[in-house]
Amino acid sequence: MSGTRASNDRPPSAGGVKRGRLQHEAATTGSRVTVVLGAQWGDEGKGKVVDLLATDADVVSRCQGGNNAGHTVVVDGKEYDFHLLPSGIINPKAVSFIGNGVVVHLPGLFEEAEKNEKKGLKDWEKRLVISDRAHLVFDFHQAVDGLQEVQRQAQEGKNIGTTRKGIGPAYSSKAARTGLRICDLLSDFDEFSSRFKNLARQHQSMFPSLEVDVEGQLKRLKGFAERIRPMVRDGVYFMYEALHGPPKKILVEGANAALLDIDFGTYPFVTSSNCTVGGVCTGLGIPPQNIGEVYGVVKAYTTRVGIGAFPTEQINEIGDLLQSRGHEWGVTTGRKRRCGWLDLMILRYAHMVNGFTALALTKLDILDALDEIKVGVAYKLGGKRIPYFPANQEILQKVEVEYETLPGWKADTTGARKWEDLPPQAQSYIRFVENHVGVAVKWVGVGKSRDSMIQLF
């Protein structure tokens, strides 16, 4: 037996500690993040839910997207609009973190901050941390975004309906491994300048009409570099410290929504990032075991901006009523949102992908004026129910929606502050959603302000 080890022997663990205990500790130590995600096509009211949870959070994070997102938060009668900044930046006690999965347009970041400063936002620079691995969006990315939309319209007679914020082109540069990151900007500026010029030339070769003021943009970027330098950290280490140091409440604010996810959304009419729960891990550099609560935010009806399949859309007086009562214009684009009945197939699909632990049902008050309310409960193809959400857009356009009709409540719910204040028919509507999706509703929104979110448990 000399020089050999019996088959049931194991090499000693470091320090003689039993391997099983190490594995257990590795799997269970650390805080867990609370995630807020959109469950439809965006504009569900995620910012309001985040604002509610951010009041006692220590860290509020963004993990994907860019300034194509739009979150509105009302505090003390003041309406703040956020696109790139986490809406938790309002909390003076919390650190706001922009993770590596976010693409950052620096001029847009400072413009957004300055607009909100005029409304009362203070000392945001002291509370903002930006991952050094986050990719940059340049002005020419935004110009290319617009040129691509024009091309698509000319070639196919339709466009994707992007926000023209350069998000898709920036993620394309990232995937092509030609993109530039925050850490590159803060390192050797001569090297950064060389790579920036090459990237600009690449885009000009693809789009001959593209004009790029290379020297002007580099001058601006050099100025921005010094402004953001104090905010930049190694993002992975920052999150590791937050998770494994003294216990902290960490909140993740998802941008966009499940049906806009690059993989699971209604492709190609989607955004360019993963806005489902998997994007939290890749966009912040954290392991799955540190995901805790996952809250899905759902509007009490359905809206969508731009083109693409929308099975429950109401192109009639119902759609017009929802649009006008709900003030359905995009925060980022100002575009009118398409409106329709609540679609439970979408919610069940979003739950399959995200594993929601609870839902927030927002804008219930918009339904106050309706005599009856329809809810899409199933899709049919060829007269037969299908148990899945179709990936193919042409098929999704053809589905027949099976509806159930519920009685309206014809009463003002905006003053409700607890479950008992809601009309019985409104309570039945909420329970109907819970039963069909299989997830409990934790909050019900009946207005814009922070105190108009009714907590059920």
Curated annotation (Swiss-Prot):
SMART domains per record: Adenylsucc_synt (SM00788)
Residues noted as binding GTP in the record, renumbered to the chain: 42-48, 70-72, 337, 363-365, 445-448
Residues holding IMP: D43, E44, G45, K46, N68, A69, G70, H71, T163, R177, N256, T271, R335
Region (Disordered): 1-25
GO cellular component terms given for this protein: cytoplasm
Residues that hold Mg(2+) according to the record: D43, G70
Main EC class the enzyme belongs to: ligase
Annotated substrate binding sites: D43, V331, T332, T333, G334, R335, K336, R337
Enzyme Commission number: 6.3.4.4
PANTHER family per UniProt: ADENYLOSUCCINATE SYNTHETASE, ADENYLOSUCCINATE SYNTHETASE ISOZYME 1
Biological function: Component of the purine nucleotide cycle (PNC), which interconverts IMP and AMP to regulate the nucleotide levels in various tissues, and which contributes to glycolysis and ammoniagenesis. Catalyzes the first committed step in the biosynthesis of AMP from IMP.
UniProt name for this protein: Adenylosuccinate synthetase isozyme 1
Lineage summary: Eukaryota, Metazoa, Chordata, Craniata, Vertebrata
